[in-house]
Amino acid sequence: MSPLRPLLLALALASVPCAQGACPASADLKHSDGTRTCAKLYDKSDPYYENCCGGAELSLESGADLPYLPSNWANTASSLVVAPRCELTVWSRQGKAGKTHKFSAGTYPRLEEYRRGILGDWSNAISALYCRCS
């Protein structure tokens, strides 16, 4: 196998227009009146990126502080998008306990790709959160 083949494959995948999937761009988290949403959580993800960020949606305004997520959202989020100049801090247990992770501005279509400790990941593992924008 040519050493050039993996490089060409990586370049081809990077140039695919839908590589980020059906998730909105982080810059698109704005309201018509000029205010912005800090982050959006989605309860559906998929091995195919174009099918991510589907299902139910939870929008968070800047300053959202939820040590206890609503019962239908606890351990449910599997995709998320964070607006520019915003940061979403999540915890694995209610009351802001357990493992923690900070997501900066960007699109995260598959939370399975983000490690939570040695054996876990962040898909269906968010029990508390805090979202802030500067």
From Swiss-Prot:
Keyword Membrane tagged: yes
Localisation: Zymogen granule membrane; Zymogen granule lumen
UniProt key word Protein transport: no
Bilayer disposition of the protein: Peripheral membrane protein
Residues making up the signal peptide according to the UniProt record: 1-21
A GO biological process held by the record: exocytosis
Chief place of localization: membrane
Keywords from the UniProt entry: Cytoplasmic vesicle, Disulfide bond, Exocytosis, Membrane, Signal
Post-translational modification: Contains intrachain disulfide bonds.
Pfam family, any one: Syncollin
GO cellular component, one term: zymogen granule membrane
Source superkingdom: Eukaryota
Subunit annotation: Monomer and homooligomer; most probably hexameric. Interacts with GP2.
Functional summary from the UniProt entry: Functions in exocytosis in pancreatic acinar cells regulating the fusion of zymogen granules with each other. May have a pore-forming activity on membranes and regulate exocytosis in other exocrine tissues.
PANTHER family xref list: SYNCOLLIN
Protein name stated in the entry: Syncollin
Species classification: Eukaryota, Metazoa, Chordata, Craniata, Vertebrata
Gene that this sequence comes from: SYCN
